[in-house]
Amino acid sequence: MTDLPEKEGGRFHASVLTLYPEMFPGPLGISLAGKALAEGKWQLDTVQIRDFAEGRHRMVDDTPSGGGAGMVMKADVVARALDSVDDGRPMLLMTPRGKPLTQERVRALADGAGAIILCGRFEGVDERVIEGRNLEEISIGDYILSGGETAAIVLLDAVVRLLPGVMGNRESGETESFETGLLEHPHYTRPQEWEGRAIPDILTSGNHGAIDKWRLEQAERITRERRPDLWEAYCKNRRKIGGQ
């Protein structure tokens, strides 16, 4: 097993394999991610999968063995594309059948040298290349998109904002939803009153201990009501820490 590569100049390097390279950087070229990209805090390149197809028609897909609807991305073509950029970075396949993307996985990727991201299309990718290249299958939710490009953008946006120097306030990232195991507490800003609704008095009291307590209580309430799965995991972790 080879050692994972170190970050080149400290930069996270993303290589996206796609049939639609024109979709990148897309939203990753603006706001936090775009500024960080322009400043060289991370690197993005795309690989056109069709460049690795052979024959006059440069076919990247074929009919599914055993019959069925749609087309399947060819193992040989995809493998050549992957091999062209393989340097030990994790290889990810964006697919609805993958493991759900979590903030924990996002943090792990942000701490690494980068990722090679394969964007699926059609009915999917030949299983043999998934096994042969040890692709990690990742899903961003229980719904179907036209392709993996949008999912790759979501993943990269989540990763890039955690890279050093990208977010101005480190605390902002550490207190967001999922970072603490809870959904985030409510936020307010001026004016003090809007359409008869006032900012909770506790937030303007200047008592930071009381404010922290209120925010935790609100985060716990929202998580308990909206994400019982997260609430159960949070409670389990608290019991573990408490030695109960």
Swiss-Prot record:
Pfam family, one: tRNA_m1G_MT
The enzyme's E.C. designation: 2.1.1.228
Main localization category: cytoplasm
Coiled-coil annotated residue ranges, if any: none
Annotated positions binding S-adenosyl-L-methionine: G120, I140, G141, D142, Y143, I144, L145
UniProt keyword terms in alphabetical order: Cytoplasm, Methyltransferase, S-adenosyl-L-methionine, Transferase, tRNA processing
GO cellular component: cytosol
Reaction(s) catalysed (UniProt annotation): guanosine(37) in tRNA + S-adenosyl-L-methionine = N(1)-methylguanosine(37) in tRNA + S-adenosyl-L-homocysteine + H(+)
Annotated localization: Cytoplasm
GO molecular function: tRNA (guanine(37)-N1)-methyltransferase activity
SUPFAM superfamilies: alpha/beta knot
Alphabetical list of InterPro entries matching this protein: Alpha/beta_knot_MTases (IPR029028), tRNA_m1G_MeTrfase_C_sf (IPR023148), tRNA_m1G_MeTrfase_TrmD (IPR002649), tRNA_m1G_MTases_N (IPR029026), tRNA_MeTrfase_TRMD/TRM10 (IPR016009)
GO BP terms, alphabetized: tRNA N1-guanine methylation
Record function comment: Specifically methylates guanosine-37 in various tRNAs.
Alphabetized PANTHER family for the sequence: TRNA (GUANINE-N(1)-)-METHYLTRANSFERASE
Family: Belongs to the RNA methyltransferase TrmD family.
Subunit structure: Homodimer.
Annotated protein name in UniProt: tRNA (guanine-N(1)-)-methyltransferase
Naturally occurring in which organism (per UniProt): Brucella abortus (strain 2308)
Source taxonomy: Bacteria, Pseudomonadati, Pseudomonadota, Alphaproteobacteria, Hyphomicrobiales
